[in-house]
């Protein structure tokens, strides 16, 4: 496997599954204002089309060209082929195939940053933030002036995962974005990500505003930056200035990733109903976009429209079967419908891909603990004990779970 700075664990970003009422503030799907799968999509690593050595014909005889290829030509050509294969599979959302191809490229040339960057991309596409961070860190180590890798690493570091290192990650996200704009001062996305990183740190100040405005100045068609600036101004108490910026972002948005970002920002501002038409537009463009499906499912769960949420969330899990969050939200929908066996199945699947922080959240009231409570209410004590035990396995230090387990096992 490719060498990375941190142990690559499975999966995704954290949402404690958020709601019993609309008034509860939900975590952003892809980050505070950032974007992960379907919201920020870094471009594919560049794969060179290497020309193979071909014979030439002289005086009726076939002989090789006089230029002798380097000894590692075959390795280089195979590496480029694997990159191309990974890129094509990624574009088709065949993530397992893409991962295998990029990993194969990394095995051939372990210090070529493009393989690590490609792996980071497909992990980010699936919201496997910890995996993506590890891969992008390797890419930056191998190519410290690669602006695309710096920006991508900044993106994944702003994804909310919980844990004690959140503040450190946000500081690093700012550092990598700042380095990117120093290397390329005309990189609009890098300026936008600098604003995101500053805002993630709680720094809603003139520099944050300037970063977003600089991104817009460099690319007036950059819908994402308008949405980010609008959200920052909302947080700064300047809601009247934010309204036309959201409108401009919606006007400029032409693709699902941008529409997802706008919808995500609206949901984070508790403007849930405003996010619905934006998500409908996104799904009209790409009915299988996993982020659009998940955001729509989340919107419906917030309003307790569980039956309507189910098909969106099920399809999201089909498109990204190893993603934690859609499974977690699907389990919440089943719990809301009192389909306890289905909820248990969804939570069991989610647990396979949860990080350590996510495991504790999955153990809670919107996970196995809530499932156990549901079984107790239905007088299914044996099933309740199983759910509480599962919760305790995920969060061993939780005394409340221990007490509930004891009660469920009592005759």
Model-identified regions with their sequence ranges:
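N-terminal propeptides/low-complexity segments immediately following signal peptides
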Residues: 26-64
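Structural signature of tandem alpha-helical TPR/SEL1-like repeats
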Residues: 93-100, 104, 125-138, 161-179, ...
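Helix-start (N-cap) detector for alpha-helical repeat units in TPR-like alpha-solenoids
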Residues: 79, 113-114, 147-148, 188-189, ...
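TPR/TPR-like alpha-solenoid helical repeat scaffolds
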Residues: 155-156, 265, 360-370, 399-411
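Structural marker of alpha-solenoid helical repeat scaffolds
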Residues: 108, 142, 183, 218, ...
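Canonical tetratricopeptide repeat
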Residues: 118, 152, 193, 228, ...
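TPR-adjacent "capping" and linker segments in tetratricopeptide-repeat scaffold/adaptor proteins
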Residues: 64-81, 356-365
